[in-house]
């Protein structure tokens, strides 16, 4: 696989599977964290290669590597695509669920999952008859391709040990030639997937979206199911679009809905204060009040946002609301000198 991708123009960097404290990998959180750290090291090291485009990074993982690459993607925005070759992300629910930062919103990148046919957990989950939860089915922010390679067993996804060094009687009900044919399909799909999502190749994308049979791969060799992204990750930009579409009203309600959709969604009170000032400068004081109120809803002790809200109320001619906002600014931060001055001025009728 590595040699093939390199022959297609990709810069390929690989490492072997090593445990945290020993050569042998352990199937626990410590083991996957160690391998995820190795991936992060390799990705960072690629920055020293002049031919490497760091805006187009993918991580391909076999077996345990098909779990640790998900951990790595959750912690690095550099990783733009994932490939799982019968990866352990399908089987080790207790491990990925124990990592608080490994969640769909943090791994919102396309994934190609090619696996053996023995345990189709993702389909079982959708039928509400699942032995374990499927992380892949929960990746609602990602395009996911589920490929099933019928002739292949787990070890066959490693070409060296899976079939090059295997005896002819180690292929179950299939022949060596059947497994080799399936492996060629695996390599081809990985190549096309990377071309589609890293190089934005339209022909490669069309290849992925049609059935394997249309691509010359027999149904007894491969089946493919495509699960398109069902939503976009809630973001500040998305919040602002929704806020504008709502007529610059209901900022707190929009924020609450987006928080409910994703626990990872967060807005910066500092940014909200800045954005509110931009609306205030654009003669949209009502919208500015909404953002200032949201800022103090998120951070009640943010005195500057209370002071900003006071200014917006003044722009609207709402004296009492302005005084109330300024008083809250001073209550949480005695250094809000503008608020102190405006309270005196407004009470004096100025």
What are these regions (language model features)?
Residues 151-155, 160-303, 320, 324-327, ...:
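Alpha/beta-hydrolase-fold serine-hydrolase catalytic core, especially in secreted/extracellular enzymes
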Residues 309, 316, 342-343:
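Residue-level signature of tetratricopeptide-repeat
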């Amino acid at each position: 696989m590595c040699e093939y991708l390199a022959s297609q123009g990709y810069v390929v960097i690989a490492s072997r599977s090593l445990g945290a404290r020993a050569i042998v990998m352990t199937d626990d959180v410590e083991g996957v964290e160690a391998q995820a750290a190795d991936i992060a090291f390799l990705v960072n090291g690629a920055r020293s290669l002049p031919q490497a485009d760091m805006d187009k990074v993918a991580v391909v993982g076999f077996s345990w590597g098909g779990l640790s690459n998900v951990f790595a993607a959750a912690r690095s925005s550099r990783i733009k695509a994932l490939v799982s070759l019968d990866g352990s992300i399908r089987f080790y629910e207790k491990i990925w669920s124990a990592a608080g930062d490994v969640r769909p919103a943090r791994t919102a990148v396309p994934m190609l999952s090619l696996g053996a046919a023995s345990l189709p957990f993702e389909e079982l989950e959708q039928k509400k008859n699942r032995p374990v939860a499927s992380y892949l089915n929960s990746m609602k922010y990602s395009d996911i391709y589920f490929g099933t390679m019928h002739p292949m067993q787990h070890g066959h996804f490693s070409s060296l040990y899976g079939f090059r060094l295997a005896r002819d009687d180690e292929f179950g009900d299939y022949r060596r030639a059947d497994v080799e044919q399936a492996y060629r399909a695996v390599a081809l799909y990985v190549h096309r997937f990377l071309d589609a999502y890293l190089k934005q190749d339209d022909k490669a994308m069309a290849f992925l979206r049609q059935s394997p049979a249309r691509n010359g791969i027999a149904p007894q060799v491969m089946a493919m199911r495509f699960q398109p992204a069902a939503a976009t990750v809630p973001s500040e930009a998305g919040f602002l679009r929704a806020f504008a579409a709502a007529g610059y009203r209901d900022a707190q309600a929009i924020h609450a809905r987006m928080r409910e959709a994703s626990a990872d969604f967060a807005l910066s009170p500092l940014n909200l204060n800045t954005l509110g000032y931009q609306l205030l400068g654009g003669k949209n004081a009502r919208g500015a009040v909404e953002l200032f109120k949201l800022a103090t809803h998120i951070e009640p002790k943010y005195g500057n946002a209370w002071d900003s809200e006071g200014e917006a109320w003044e722009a609207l001619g709402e004296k009492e609301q302005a005084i109330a906002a300024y008083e809250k600014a001073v209550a949480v931060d005695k250094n809000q000198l503008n608020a102190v001055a405006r309270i005196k001025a407004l009470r004096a009728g100025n």
